[in-house]
Amino acid sequence: TPAEAFPNTQAKLASFAAGKGTILFFEDMDVVRSLQEQFALYAENFPIWSDQSTGIAQHAVWVALAEANIGANLQHYNPIIDEEVAATWNIPANWKLTGQMPFGSIEAPAAPKDFMDDADRFMVIK
């Protein structure tokens, strides 16, 4: 983080630390490599499918927390924190950290976000 932006980053990290906990998401890259070897025709797709699978898992956990009225947000401080996380929790070297989800009480509603119009990003083809 550039020095001029660090105060904002520090405040954000403090808000995560004030939560009840953080869920860490990992992908076992040995499994991905094994599937690449077993199904060589699709080898280049397995890292992509791995990313998609972790995205689905992250979304499912977020939805489950939201349904329980627990606030959460998804963060990606990789690779900055990878070594520290692995050392702190004795994470196997073949596990790739893919995301962090701090969770806790909902202190305020989420701020509104601007999104691209659905008509510009979604197509129905008949």
Model-derived features: positions:
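Glycine/small-residue-rich phosphate/adenosyl-binding loop
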Residues: 1-54
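C-terminal helix-cap and adjacent tail motif
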Residues: 4, 96-126
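Glycine-rich, charged/polar anion/phosphate-binding loops
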Residues: 6-11, 85-87, 109
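Generic beta-strand structural signal
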Residues: 19-22, 68, 99
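Conserved residues at the C-terminal ends of beta-strands
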Residues: 26, 76, 103-104
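Small-aliphatic-rich amphipathic alpha-helix that forms the alpha element of a beta-alpha
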Residues: 29, 38-87
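Generic structural signal of hydrophobic/aromatic residues within well-ordered alpha-helices
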Residues: 35, 85, 119-122
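Short, hinge-like loop/turn segments at secondary-structure boundaries
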Residues: 90-93
